Amino acid sequence: MTRKQRRLVFIGTCGAVLAVALGLVLWAMSGTIVFFRSPSEIAREAVAPGVRFRLGGLVEAGSVVRGPDSQVTFAVTDNAARLPVRYRGLLPDLFREGQGVVAEGAMEPGGVFRADTVLAKHDETYMPREVADALKKSGRWQEGAGHPAPAPPRTASGEARAP
């Protein structure tokens, strides 16, 4: 073989090795690329206990029960299925019934999702109270221009405080 042919074979071999490596990495990550699963997907797939994943949906109205030692149970729904969730810890300020939520954790044998982390989702119109106050103070707040009312202050337990 000439020098040019050897160089082409070398480049082709390196390209094939990189393509195989990339394919293996993508195949290994295929189960973790999904941002979250809905309660309907969990019901269809019958996830085994102990498998970690992210659960996303809305906090079902009337399902939040606060227990001792920061224990909270609630249900996540996608309006087609519901999944009970157990969480121990402080909830985000935006957590409330009817609000979007993403919980990370694993299924327990009884069909309850045990969350280690709970994230509250909000839409693009949410504005923290501190930002709204700063805009009002600087004179840039435009009343009635589509800005939502600022979120009420909350205690460490997530309860709304009286203004």
Swiss-Prot record:
<feature type="topological domain" description="Cytoplasmic">
    <location>
        <begin position="1"/>
        <end position="7"/>
    </location>
</feature>
<feature type="binding site" description="covalent">
    <location>
        <position position="122"/>
    </location>
    <ligand>
        <name>heme</name>
    </ligand>
</feature>
<protein>
    <recommendedName>
        <fullName>Cytochrome c-type biogenesis protein CcmE</fullName>
    </recommendedName>
</protein>
<dbReference type="GO" id="GO:0046872">
    <property type="term" value="F:metal ion binding"/>
</dbReference>
<dbReference type="GO" id="GO:0017004">
    <property type="term" value="P:cytochrome complex assembly"/>
</dbReference>
<keyword id="KW-0997">Cell inner membrane</keyword>
<keyword id="KW-1003">Cell membrane</keyword>
<feature type="binding site" description="axial binding residue">
    <location>
        <position position="126"/>
    </location>
    <ligand>
        <name>heme</name>
    </ligand>
</feature>
<dbReference type="GO" id="GO:0020037">
    <property type="term" value="F:heme binding"/>
</dbReference>
<dbReference type="InterPro" id="IPR004329">
    <property type="entry name" value="CcmE"/>
</dbReference>
<feature type="region of interest" description="Disordered">
    <location>
        <begin position="134"/>
        <end position="163"/>
    </location>
</feature>
<keyword id="KW-0735">Signal-anchor</keyword>
<feature type="transmembrane region" description="Helical; Signal-anchor for type II membrane protein">
    <location>
        <begin position="8"/>
        <end position="28"/>
    </location>
</feature>
<dbReference type="InterPro" id="IPR012340">
    <property type="entry name" value="NA-bd_OB-fold"/>
</dbReference>
<keyword id="KW-0201">Cytochrome c-type biogenesis</keyword>
<keyword id="KW-0349">Heme</keyword>
<keyword id="KW-1133">Transmembrane helix</keyword>
<keyword id="KW-0812">Transmembrane</keyword>
<feature type="topological domain" description="Periplasmic">
    <location>
        <begin position="29"/>
        <end position="163"/>
    </location>
</feature>
<dbReference type="GO" id="GO:0005886">
    <property type="term" value="C:plasma membrane"/>
</dbReference>
<comment type="function">
    <text>Heme chaperone required for the biogenesis of c-type cytochromes. Transiently binds heme delivered by CcmC and transfers the heme to apo-cytochromes in a process facilitated by CcmF and CcmH.</text>
</comment>
<comment type="similarity">
    <text>Belongs to the CcmE/CycJ family.</text>
</comment>
<keyword id="KW-0408">Iron</keyword>
<dbReference type="Pfam" id="PF03100">
    <property type="entry name" value="CcmE"/>
</dbReference>
<keyword id="KW-0479">Metal-binding</keyword>
<dbReference type="InterPro" id="IPR036127">
    <property type="entry name" value="CcmE-like_sf"/>
</dbReference>
<keyword id="KW-0472">Membrane</keyword>
